[in-house]
Amino acid sequence: MKRTIAIVAGGDTSEFHVSLRSAQGIYSFIDKEKYTLYIVEMQGTRWEVQLPDGAKAPVDRNDFSFMLGTEKIRFDFAYITIHGTPGEDGRLQGYFDMMHIPYSCCGVLAAAITYDKFTCNQYLKAFGVRIAESLLLRQGQSVSDEDVMEKIGLPCFIKPSLGGSSFGVTKVKTKEQIQPAIVKAFEEAQEVLVEAFMEGTELTCGCYKTKDKTVIFPPTEVVTHNEFFDYDAKYNGQVDEITPARISDELTNRVQMLTSAIYDILGCSGIIRVDYIVTAGEKINLLEVNTTPGMTTTSFIPQQVRAAGLDIKDVMTDIIENKF
């Protein structure tokens, strides 16, 4: 019998529509001869299954099921592709743990740690991972322009400590831009990160592990035509994504080994993607860890799967079957 898979998308942040695009990608990638697929759209308390006829059916949150005519359909597995709350921060993982429904990505602790960029980077710093100098501001806290310039320097990035897709991110070059950038970041999250700018080559590397194998993809080099890799660059083509990256075999291996180590340190599961900046002297600096990376047909992970000579359908099967 086919397993019934929920591709869980949507969420409660600005990344709602990005998540739905990832869900369509995943729907196209998963082997439909092995699995019955439904996209489950979540937004606040609205949990709905997209039905083949275009209608939507409410999800019973008591057991994560829905009615298809007179038949009650239960899900065997959840592929979480929500970018942001509640699917990337551990909340939904806790729900599925209580429902005893296996899912595609990291558990509660790893998801919660990685969703908060400051917490994740400070945690990994304790294991010897290089990170940028940074300051954290919580709601209600303030920092003077002088402190930012003295402790972090300019240019710097001011961004939400939570979330992704570069919503609320500003590259700050002048003193006058500091406070408006903080206000903008607080519109997206309750914690704001002030982070030193690092000059170098931006790389991103995906990885997944199952009970019997480790797969580390070829890194991608990110060359943006914008000021930085912002939403416009990510989703409107203002970037060159070069896979595999134009770096030496030795540096490629170091990036891949660091990605694998970060996966293990955090106790990850499923596919992750780690973003880096390589600065002078080939120093590898962590930018952030993504535990529910974008999965549109043009996203980094599908690119890296192709560059590795793998079939994305087989990768999806690995992720699902590893939980049974």
UniProtKB/Swiss-Prot annotation:
Keyword Cytoplasm assigned: yes
Binding residues for Mg(2+) 2: E288, N290
Pfam families the record matches: Dala_Dala_lig_C, Dala_Dala_lig_N
GO CC, one annotated term: cytoplasm
Source organism superkingdom: Bacteria
Keyword Membrane: no
Name under which the protein is recorded: D-alanine--D-alanine ligase
Provenance organism: Bacteroides thetaiotaomicron (strain ATCC 29148 / DSM 2079 / JCM 5827 / CCUG 10774 / NCTC 10582 / VPI-5482 / E50)
